[in-house]
């Protein structure tokens, strides 16, 4: 099946596909033009001053490359995990009446599994902020 027939008309489903293809080409062209303009107008020779970190107009004192403590990463990962779980629970709450008791049982199992995971992380010390040398 050809997108455009010999008489110049489109089949019923093909105008949407044709519009999608035209849109994709236009977006790709726009992105390419923006990247080219940024490259063309951009700084060619960055010096030491340009590479220095900017701290609100104040001359930096010390290195800007500091290491973050690992608990911050762990809290971020736990937040993402439990945030996604919250999204699942919210969608379940919206469709609660249609799902009935079967959906309630499935969500209860899901929440129970989440609680088991939270207790596991807690017991392994993932929520403890003390330094590792001070743990008992």
Curated annotation (Swiss-Prot):
Free-text function comment from the UniProt entry: NDH-1 shuttles electrons from NADH, via FMN and iron-sulfur (Fe-S) centers, to quinones in the respiratory chain. The immediate electron acceptor for the enzyme in this species is believed to be ubiquinone. Couples the redox reaction to proton translocation (for every two electrons transferred, four hydrogen ions are translocated across the cytoplasmic membrane), and thus conserves the redox energy in a proton gradient.
Residue spans crossing the bilayer: 20-40, 70-90, 99-119
Q: Does the record bear Membrane in its keywords? A: yes
- List the signal peptide residues: none
The record's catalysed reaction(s) read:
a quinone + NADH + 5 H(+)(in) = a quinol + NAD(+) + 4 H(+)(out)
Q: How does it assemble?
A: NDH-1 is composed of 14 different subunits. Subunits NuoA, H, J, K, L, M, N constitute the membrane sector of the complex.
A GO MF term: NADH dehydrogenase (ubiquinone) activity
Q: What organism is listed for this UniProt entry?
A: Syntrophobacter fumaroxidans (strain DSM 10017 / MPOB)
Topology in the lipid bilayer: Multi-pass membrane protein
What protein am I looking at? NADH-quinone oxidoreductase subunit A
Q: List the disulfide bonds.
A: none
Q: Where in the cell is it found?
A: Cell inner membrane
Which InterPro entries does the entry link to? NAD(P)H_OxRDtase_bac/plastid, NADH_UbQ/plastoQ_OxRdtase_su3, NDAH_ubi_oxred_su3_sf
Enzyme Commission code: 7.1.1.-
Task: Give the record's GO CC terms.
Answer: NADH dehydrogenase complex; plasma membrane
Similarity comment: Belongs to the complex I subunit 3 family.
Which key words are in the record? Cell inner membrane, Cell membrane, Membrane, NAD, Quinone, Translocase, Transmembrane, Transmembrane helix, Transport, Ubiquinone
The EC class name is translocase
Q: So which domain of life are we looking at?
A: Bacteria
């Amino acid at each position: 099946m050809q997108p455009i027939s010999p008489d110049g008309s489109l089949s019923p489903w093909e105008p949407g596909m044709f519009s999608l293809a035209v849109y994709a080409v236009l977006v790709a062209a726009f992105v390419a033009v923006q990247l080219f303009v940024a490259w063309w107008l951009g700084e060619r020779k960055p010096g030491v001053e340009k590479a220095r970190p900017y701290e609100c107009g104040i001359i930096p004192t010390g290195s800007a490359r500091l290491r973050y403590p690992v608990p911050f990463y762990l809290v971020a990962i736990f937040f993402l995990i439990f945030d996604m779980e919250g999204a699942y629970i919210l969608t379940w709450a919206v469709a609660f009446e249609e799902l009935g008791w079967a959906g309630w049982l499935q969500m209860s199992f899901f929440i129970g599994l989440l609680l088991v995971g939270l207790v596991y992380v807690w017991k392994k010390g993932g929520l403890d902020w003390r330094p590792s040398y001070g743990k008992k």
